[in-house]
């Protein structure tokens, strides 16, 4: 009985290998009917570009900036920058002065640099995935 089963399995295996190993031939698309549909290519839009054209590209946005953007300001990176990001969103630039438990030195640094900040509504393109503290730029 086992020889019959072995022989049968061998035949099935040989037939399967022979049948499934044949590669189908590629056939050209028939375009003789004159109707060709093509995708309409639109202009690529990066959602960040619109925001960067605004004041965000010139000043540090308190609601959308990553911690690394604060490196250009002396005394902000990383501690004060992290506190600013953790207490966002802000309705106005002056709201950053209301962060709890700021030292006098930190408060003075914020007041000195208020003109370098802006506030825009939080944009998913910049804060999606909670990547404001570690953007992965190394």
Curated annotation (Swiss-Prot):
The keyword Thylakoid applies. It is a peripheral membrane protein. One of its GO terms (biological process) is photosynthesis. One of its GO terms (cellular component) is plasma membrane-derived thylakoid membrane. SUPFAM superfamilies: PsbU/PolX domain-like. It is found in: Cellular thylakoid membrane. InterPro entries: PSII_PsbU. Keywords: Electron transport, Membrane, Photosynthesis, Photosystem II, Signal, Thylakoid, Transport. Residues 1-28 form the signal peptide. Its main location: membrane. The keyword Nucleus does not apply. Residues 29-42 form a propeptide. PSII is composed of 1 copy each of membrane proteins PsbA, PsbB, PsbC, PsbD, PsbE, PsbF, PsbH, PsbI, PsbJ, PsbK, PsbL, PsbM, PsbT, PsbX, PsbY, PsbZ, Psb30/Ycf12, peripheral proteins PsbO, CyanoQ (PsbQ), PsbU, PsbV and a large number of cofactors. It forms dimeric complexes. Belongs to the PsbU family. One of the extrinsic, lumenal subunits of photosystem II (PSII). PSII is a light-driven water plastoquinone oxidoreductase, using light energy to abstract electrons from H(2)O, generating a proton gradient subsequently used for ATP formation. The extrinsic proteins stabilize the structure of photosystem II oxygen-evolving complex (OEC), the ion environment of oxygen evolution and protect the OEC against heat-induced inactivation. This is Photosystem II extrinsic protein U. It comes from Picosynechococcus sp. (strain ATCC 27264 / PCC 7002 / PR-6). The gene is psbU.
């Amino acid at each position: 009985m086992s020889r019959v089963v072995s022989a049968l399995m061998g035949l099935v295996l040989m037939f399967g290998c022979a049948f499934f190993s044949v590669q189908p031939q590629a056939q050209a698309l028939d375009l003789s009917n004159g109707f060709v549909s093509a995708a309409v290519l639109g202009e690529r839009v990066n959602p960040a570009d619109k925001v960067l054209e605004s004041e965000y590209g010139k000043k540090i946005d308190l609601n959308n900036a990553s911690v690394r953007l604060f490196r250009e300001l002396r005394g902000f990176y990383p501690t004060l920058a992290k506190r600013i990001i953790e207490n966002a969103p802000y309705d106005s630039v002056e709201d950053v002065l209301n962060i709890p438990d700021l030292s006098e030195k930190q408060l003075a640094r914020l007041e000195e640099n208020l003109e370098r900040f802006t506030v825009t509504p939080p944009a998913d393109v910049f804060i999606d995935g909670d990547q404001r503290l570690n953007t992965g730029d190394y």
